[in-house]
Amino acid sequence: ANTVKVTLIKSTNGRLANHKAXVK
């Protein structure tokens, strides 16, 4: 379960980073 959580968090952070880059 912990591994899945970490993966989810990483993918979410990646999405946020992509969103910020696109907004810039």
Swiss-Prot record:
Translocase keyword on record: no
Keywords: Ribonucleoprotein, Ribosomal protein
Highest taxon of the lineage: Bacteria
Kinase keyword on record: no
A cellular component annotation (GO) from this entry: ribosome
SS bond list: none
Protein family: Belongs to the universal ribosomal protein uL30 family.
Subunit and interaction comment: Part of the 50S ribosomal subunit.
Name of the protein: Large ribosomal subunit protein uL30
Annotated source species: Ectopseudomonas mendocina (Pseudomonas mendocina)
Gene: rpmD
